[in-house]
Amino acid sequence: MSDMCDVVSFVGAAERVLRARFRPSPESGPPVHARRCGWSLGISAETLRRWAGQAEVDSGVVAGVSASRSGSVKTSELEQTIEILKVATSFFARKCDPRHR
């Protein structure tokens, strides 16, 4: 759990660094600051831009699916997949069991 907290705080810190140094505008050209910030943090500029974009969605600044909502949808899908795999495992276990032939 500590590793996850470290990741969350790193992502938050990276977003703050980007916001402090990078104010995008249509005429500003390529995001040099995003590349420089990403390089100094050891991540790609694209990763940093995705994190910043998701933070804007999560805070309600931009429309989109929040990370928590996306996570709950993924969790639900994974739970359904697990149930299907349990049924399939049971089916094949019975099929391969010589006592049930």
Curated annotation (Swiss-Prot):
InterPro entries: WH-like_DNA-bd_sf (IPR036388). It comes from the Bacteria. This is Uncharacterized protein Mb2112. It comes from Mycobacterium bovis (strain ATCC BAA-935 / AF2122/97).
